[in-house]
Amino acid sequence: MTAILIALMIFSGCKTNEDTKSKKAEEFANLFFEQVKVLQKTDNRIFNLEELNDNADDEAKKTVKKYYDDMREYISEEQLIKYLNDQELLSTKYYESNVTDYKIENFKAVPSDKKEGAIDATFDVTFINDSKAEIAKKSYKIRCMFDGDKMVDAFGEMFPPTEISQNK
């Protein structure tokens, strides 16, 4: 039974069509921003969810590692920004009422050097008011873990906003 599940995980991890890429980027962004909402309610503390089971057998670990290697192509800045815009996940309902727009900068997603098989992403979000002035910046870090082709965990860190002084 385990061999069948592993074979299915390997097969599903090999799909590289555009729908699959979009779905993976969407899963990544959705889980991350759900986490951001939790972090906002916990005074920006690091919030950890249950980690991937460390007792997986060697074959399963190889499968997961291969999948992580494949995931690098799924997590791109363009896909994340498109998903954020589609879902309005950085709209004013999550932040101060004077925020009317945002921009994402310094996006980077790489295989984690701290956790085998994980992907780490970092980026900054600058918040803009209705006068088109940049009023605050927040930096984000996230680590995502997968089991086969399904994201099973994510945890992150949100740093407090940095006010941007206005030149008058």
Locations of regions flagged by a protein language model:
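A short linear-motif detector with a strong N-terminal bias
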Residues: 82-83, 98-102, 121-123, 131-133
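Core segments of small alpha/beta cavity-forming domains
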Residues: 20-93
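Exposed beta-sheet edge and beta->alpha loop/turn motif
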Residues: 110-168
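A short, amphipathic edge element
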Residues: 92-112
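Bacterial signal peptide processing site
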Residues: 15-17
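C-terminal motif of bacterial Sec signal peptides marking the signal peptidase cleavage site
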Residues: 10-13
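Sec-dependent signal peptide recognition
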Residues: 1-4
